[in-house]
Amino acid sequence: MGTKCCKPVSCGMCKKTENTLMDYKGNPILLTTEFTVLTDTESEEEGMADLEKPLLERVQATLAAKCDTEVEKKLPLKSKK
């Protein structure tokens, strides 16, 4: 079904399949020159991990301190005898 649907659209516009996209004015969009290929995003992911780690540690420390405070509030006070 996919090839039957796409065939009339791509055959009518251009001979090459990379030029079959049109903008709102009817001009062809050349995918090879308009967009760049993303091949390696590993370095970006590593950079984000380095930024997220200190933030995560701060959030965990804040939550731990808050939990400790809540536990102390709920503990019964020991009376001196």
Swiss-Prot record:
Known function: Plays an important role in the cytoplasmic envelopment of tegument proteins and capsids during the assembly and egress processes. Also participates in viral entry at the fusion step probably by regulating the core fusion machinery.
HAMAP family: HSV_CEP3_betahv
Annotated organism of origin: Human herpesvirus 6B (strain Z29)
Family under the similarity heading: Belongs to the herpesviridae cytoplasmic envelopment protein 3 family.
Protein name: Cytoplasmic envelopment protein 3
InterPro entries hit by this protein: Herpes_UL11_megaloV/roseoloV, HSV_CEP3_betahv
Disulphide linkage map: none
The keyword Phosphoprotein is annotated on this UniProt entry: yes
Localization per Swiss-Prot or TrEMBL: Virion tegument; Virion membrane; Host cell membrane; Host Golgi apparatus membrane
Lineage: Viruses, Duplodnaviria, Heunggongvirae, Peploviricota, Herviviricetes
Lipid attachment, kind N-myristoyl glycine: 2
Gene (name only): U71
Keyword Phosphoprotein: yes
